[in-house]
Amino acid sequence: MHSRLPVPASLCLLLLLPSVLPASMPGGLSPRDVTDPEVQEAAVFAVEEYNARSTNSNYFKALRLVQAESQVVSGAKYYLTMELVKTSCRKTNGNPKGYQEIQNCRLPPRNQQEKLTCHFEVWSRPWLNKTLLTKVTCN
């Protein structure tokens, strides 16, 4: 039995097909909900590592997780865009603060706040119990 759709109409249907299929492809970047627990875990790790590596005398805390994407690699790679702000909590040698403690730190007055937009890449391999911060850029 022949289709009653004219050739141009069936061609249009074929062209529309990719728009109804899932947008992500294996190995490609997929948008993630910023409230997803795995994304939140990667964000916590990124902020803790940022503070551990930073030479700033004060801690920075997360203001907002702006955007998150992930990629299936050997594990999962998270691409996070976050807003950070410098707190009034000073770093002390040998006694680093954890994420929750830092989130409770007070902020300087609004006109004295130092804010950063940071892009983090976090590579998680749970079966190895290993997470790495592979890239950080802040401005």
Swiss-Prot record:
<feature type="short sequence motif" description="Secondary area of contact">
    <location>
        <begin position="71"/>
        <end position="75"/>
    </location>
</feature>
<feature type="site" description="Reactive site">
    <location>
        <position position="27"/>
    </location>
</feature>
<dbReference type="GO" id="GO:0070062">
    <property type="term" value="C:extracellular exosome"/>
</dbReference>
<keyword id="KW-0789">Thiol protease inhibitor</keyword>
<feature type="disulfide bond">
    <location>
        <begin position="118"/>
        <end position="138"/>
    </location>
</feature>
<feature type="signal peptide">
    <location>
        <begin position="1"/>
        <end position="22"/>
    </location>
</feature>
<keyword id="KW-0732">Signal</keyword>
<protein>
    <recommendedName>
        <fullName>Cystatin-1</fullName>
    </recommendedName>
</protein>
<keyword id="KW-1015">Disulfide bond</keyword>
<dbReference type="InterPro" id="IPR000010">
    <property type="entry name" value="Cystatin_dom"/>
</dbReference>
<feature type="disulfide bond">
    <location>
        <begin position="89"/>
        <end position="105"/>
    </location>
</feature>
<dbReference type="InterPro" id="IPR018073">
    <property type="entry name" value="Prot_inh_cystat_CS"/>
</dbReference>
<comment type="similarity">
    <text>Belongs to the cystatin family.</text>
</comment>
<comment type="function">
    <text>Inhibits various C1 cysteine proteases including cathepsin L, papain and cathepsin B. This protein has no toxic activity and its function in the venom is unknown. It may play a role as housekeeping or regulatory protein.</text>
</comment>
<keyword id="KW-0964">Secreted</keyword>
<feature type="domain" description="Cystatin">
    <location>
        <begin position="27"/>
        <end position="127"/>
    </location>
</feature>
<dbReference type="Pfam" id="PF00031">
    <property type="entry name" value="Cystatin"/>
</dbReference>
<dbReference type="GO" id="GO:0004869">
    <property type="term" value="F:cysteine-type endopeptidase inhibitor activity"/>
</dbReference>
<dbReference type="InterPro" id="IPR046350">
    <property type="entry name" value="Cystatin_sf"/>
</dbReference>
<keyword id="KW-0646">Protease inhibitor</keyword>
